[in-house]
């Protein structure tokens, strides 16, 4: 199966995921813009998120971590404190993840153009993730990230003022990361030339 067949199949799956509400609404216009360009299609995406995660100490964190709360919008204090009521065991970590997209590029030249546009738009952590005979995968990402331990085994070690500060700080970083993503998205037509 070649690039065009992969693109067609992937876009059919994307349409299904959109209909099922599995794709962040705010990122759909960007996905559509990328997918309209011949040499590119998106394989995964997230508009960014803020959350509280409980990470086990002695189990595989990829399998056994759980979200106490996860928000793709700018979270509120009430959401934060309600999520913390569910804490039980393990490390309690406050996280903010930047928007992220994975884009399949037809060839290395297309990948290079996508990567240059991303980096010059401020998406400095963007990189080539994989290269195969069929496609090159480029990851689009900012450098903004928060990953802060705030407690352990059901006990929070910081006060509510610090938690509010951390949420405000993370919401502002997420907002800035989304602004950078939009600056890049507004330049995507340059790849049609």
Curated annotation (Swiss-Prot):
This entry's Gene Ontology molecular function terms read: tRNA methyltransferase activity
Is Transferase one of the keywords UniProt gives this record? yes
Q: Show the catalytic activity.
A: 4-demethyl-7-[(3S)-3-amino-3-carboxypropyl]wyosine(37) in tRNA(Phe) + S-adenosyl-L-methionine = 7-[(3S)-3-amino-3-carboxypropyl]wyosine(37) in tRNA(Phe) + S-adenosyl-L-homocysteine + H(+)
* GO-annotated biological processes: tRNA methylation; wybutosine biosynthetic process
Q: What is its EC number?
A: 2.1.1.282
- Keywords, in A-Z order: Methyltransferase, S-adenosyl-L-methionine, Transferase, tRNA processing
Q: Name one GO cellular component term.
A: cytoplasm
Q: Which domain of life is it from?
A: Archaea
Q: Which Pfam families match?
A: TYW3
Role description? S-adenosyl-L-methionine-dependent methyltransferase that acts as a component of the wyosine derivatives biosynthesis pathway.
Q: Which family does it belong to?
A: Belongs to the TYW3 family.
Q: What is this protein called?
A: tRNA(Phe) 7-((3-amino-3-carboxypropyl)-4-demethylwyosine(37)-N(4))-methyltransferase
| Gene symbol of the encoding locus | taw3
